Amino acid sequence: ADPDHLDIYGTPEAYRESFEHFTSLIRPDGCLLMKQSINVTPRLQEGVKFYTYTGAFDAKELSTFNFQLSTGSPDFYAENVRIGGGEIFFDFVGPDVRIPDIQLGVPVKVNIENGVAAIALAWLNGVTPEEIKHGMATFAGPRRRFDFHLKKENIVLIDDYAHHPAELKASILSVKELYA
């Protein structure tokens, strides 16, 4: 995980330790959904279900996302990613589920990964594929995070409060891909 808010945690090690401690607080009937490439060891109580996710899971998309996957496949991932014309679509894949043609309401490439996590949690909690597709397509995101103010044929104006180097890079790359 990319340490953030080191003003609070002090060091990257303290940041990771906080996350590991947090995982120990999950109730035995709960679950943890964790990005597969995060280099921490969760301290789960017995009875906690553990799932992993990633954004896209094929060689072409993985090189684009620059994920460092651990061995084994993630439980939840995106497949058949289509980016262009200011839109992003993908197929959601998980244990015993495939939901085709998910459209992102906030078409930022990093939101493929965020979307997979949100969809996985929704799916694990009984939300139907139809509700998931509608929710993902209509979700406008938080204010000032890839917020479209103007969308015309030759002009696009986006307000994005990205403040972490990884967030800035992801936003810039997303704009380039959406409108290349």
Where are these regions (language model features)?
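Switch II (G3) loop of P-loop NTPases
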Residues: 157-163
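Active-site beta-alpha connecting loops in nucleotide-dependent enzymes
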Residues: 141-144, 165-180
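Catalytic P-loop NTPase motifs of RecA-like helicase/translocase cores
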Residues: 4, 164-165
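Acidic, Mg2+-coordinating active-site environments of NTP-dependent enzymes
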Residues: 1-157, 177
